[in-house]
């Protein structure tokens, strides 16, 4: 794992970021934990996924060239399995959220402004659209066609629950943050501000720090 890998920003060669394999795996781990603990679907990290898959292929090729009986082979096998687990868990977490919140995710992607990063990879977008079509077809064939005419339509945006952005999450601060406004827990309390030092850990409502997760200033744990 000595080579460096290029990770571009939204496909622009000018914004290419060169990472060591260790830095790439750290990015995958952070993306995995953020996705695992965030209540909503986060920005797609498809380029990280592609680079990690490329790195896994490179590591496996190195294993085939290694001498039989070399103790390092066992450690490399363990590292490959660890990376595979993080990668598959990351993709599985995203797929489960797409299945659970698909109408809201598609609506958000549809209304995404120009220049905003996509929350779905092309493959995920195709899956979400197909999942929505299949859900509508199933509802019509199994239930809606047996209903009175005025009840034969369903608004999936209203029927499918939204992600609970008010759920609480644990986080670790990567970049110092000042005057973060925290919403009150009860009507008797008032809004207040907190400062978060680098390395500090907090339990806080996700909605409050969602922009900080997106920017990479904090990471979920």
Swiss-Prot record:
<comment type="function">
    <text>Required for initiation of chromosomal DNA replication. Core component of CDC45-MCM-GINS (CMG) helicase, the molecular machine that unwinds template DNA during replication, and around which the replisome is built.</text>
</comment>
<keyword id="KW-0539">Nucleus</keyword>
<dbReference type="InterPro" id="IPR038749">
    <property type="entry name" value="Sld5_GINS_A"/>
</dbReference>
<dbReference type="GO" id="GO:0006261">
    <property type="term" value="P:DNA-templated DNA replication"/>
</dbReference>
<dbReference type="GO" id="GO:0005634">
    <property type="term" value="C:nucleus"/>
</dbReference>
<comment type="similarity">
    <text>Belongs to the GINS4/SLD5 family.</text>
</comment>
<dbReference type="GO" id="GO:0000811">
    <property type="term" value="C:GINS complex"/>
</dbReference>
<dbReference type="InterPro" id="IPR008591">
    <property type="entry name" value="GINS_Sld5"/>
</dbReference>
<dbReference type="GO" id="GO:0003682">
    <property type="term" value="F:chromatin binding"/>
</dbReference>
<dbReference type="GO" id="GO:0006260">
    <property type="term" value="P:DNA replication"/>
</dbReference>
<dbReference type="GO" id="GO:0005737">
    <property type="term" value="C:cytoplasm"/>
</dbReference>
<dbReference type="InterPro" id="IPR031633">
    <property type="entry name" value="SLD5_C"/>
</dbReference>
<dbReference type="InterPro" id="IPR021151">
    <property type="entry name" value="GINS_A"/>
</dbReference>
<keyword id="KW-0158">Chromosome</keyword>
<dbReference type="InterPro" id="IPR036224">
    <property type="entry name" value="GINS_bundle-like_dom_sf"/>
</dbReference>
<protein>
    <recommendedName>
        <fullName>DNA replication complex GINS protein SLD5</fullName>
    </recommendedName>
</protein>
<keyword id="KW-0963">Cytoplasm</keyword>
<dbReference type="Pfam" id="PF16922">
    <property type="entry name" value="SLD5_C"/>
</dbReference>
<comment type="subunit">
    <text>Component of the GINS complex which is a heterotetramer of gins1/psf1, gins2/psf2, gins3/psf3 and gins4/sld5. Component of the CMG helicase complex, composed of the mcm2-7 complex, the GINS complex and cdc45.</text>
</comment>
<dbReference type="GO" id="GO:0000727">
    <property type="term" value="P:double-strand break repair via break-induced replication"/>
</dbReference>
<keyword id="KW-0235">DNA replication</keyword>
<dbReference type="Pfam" id="PF05916">
    <property type="entry name" value="Sld5"/>
</dbReference>
<dbReference type="GO" id="GO:0071162">
    <property type="term" value="C:CMG complex"/>
</dbReference>
């Amino acid at each position: 794992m000595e080579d460096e890998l290029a990770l571009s920003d939204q496909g622009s060669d000018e914004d290419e970021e060169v990472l060591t394999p260790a830095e790439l795996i750290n990015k995958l781990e952070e993306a995995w934990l953020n996705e695992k603990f965030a209540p909503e679907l986060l920005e797609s990290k498809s380029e990280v996924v592609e680079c990690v898959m490329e790195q896994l292929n490179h590591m496996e090729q190195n294993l085939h060239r290694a001498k039989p009986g070399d103790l390092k082979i066992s450690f490399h096998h363990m590292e490959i399995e660890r990376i595979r687990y993080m990668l598959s868990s990351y993709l599985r977490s995203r797929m489960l959220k797409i299945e659970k919140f698909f109408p809201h995710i598609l609506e958000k992607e549809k209304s995404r402004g120009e220049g905003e990063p996509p929350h779905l990879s092309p493959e995920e977008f195709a899956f979400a659209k197909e999942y929505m079509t299949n859900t509508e077809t199933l509802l019509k064939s199994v239930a809606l066609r047996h209903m009175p005419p005025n009840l034969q339509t369903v608004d999936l945006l209203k029927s499918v629950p939204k992600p609970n952005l008010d759920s609480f999450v644990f986080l670790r601060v990567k970049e110092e943050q000042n005057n973060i406004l925290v919403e009150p827990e009860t009507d008797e309390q008032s809004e207040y501000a907190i400062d978060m030092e680098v390395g500090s850990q907090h339990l806080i409502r996700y909605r409050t720090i969602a922009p900080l997760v997106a920017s990479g200033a904090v990471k979920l744990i």
